[in-house]
A protein has these predicted regions:
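Compositionally biased, intrinsically disordered low-complexity regions
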Residues: 18, 27-29, 46, 53
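Active-site and channel-lining beta-strand-loop segments
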Residues: 20-40
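Generic detector of bulky aromatic hydrophobic side chains
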Residues: 9-15, 29-30, 69-70, 75
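Active-site-adjacent loop/helix segments that line or gate small-molecule/cofactor pockets in enzymes
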Residues: 1-26, 80, 86
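Short, flexible segments with low predicted structural confidence
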Residues: 1-2, 32-33, 58-59
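Glycine-rich loop-to-alpha-helix module at the N-terminal edge of alpha/beta enzyme cores
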Residues: 37-95
Length: 95
């Protein structure tokens, strides 16, 4: 089965897909399996706003993956507390 056939067979059809299989990304560009380059206007629903494979994001992900990939919310997670503090103090207006 090719990628499109597998997606049709095994993945929930929540929305229509463009008939292109992205195999690599760099910055705002994506490449398909034939080597054709596309400008990515979707940016992973804003999850890739810095572009695909941004060096700083890649380095941070590699560092975190080497430390701890996932931890249950049953435990205290220092990074979660730090991020929550940062978001609240920067984004929430206090009376």
């Amino acid at each position: 089965m090719n990628t499109e056939e597998k997606l049709n067979q095994y993945v929930l059809h929540s929305y229509g897909r463009y008939p292109m299989a992205a195999v690599r990304g760099e910055g705002s560009r994506l490449w398909d399996s034939t080597g054709k380059c596309y400008l990515d206007f979707c940016a992973g629903i804003a999850t890739c706003v810095l572009g695909h494979c941004h060096p700083a994001v890649t380095q941070a992900l590699q560092k975190q993956a080497a430390t701890l990939v996932h931890c249950s919310n049953l435990y205290q997670i220092p990074q979660q507390a730090d991020l929550a503090e940062f978001i609240v103090t920067k984004c929430v207006e206090r009376p």
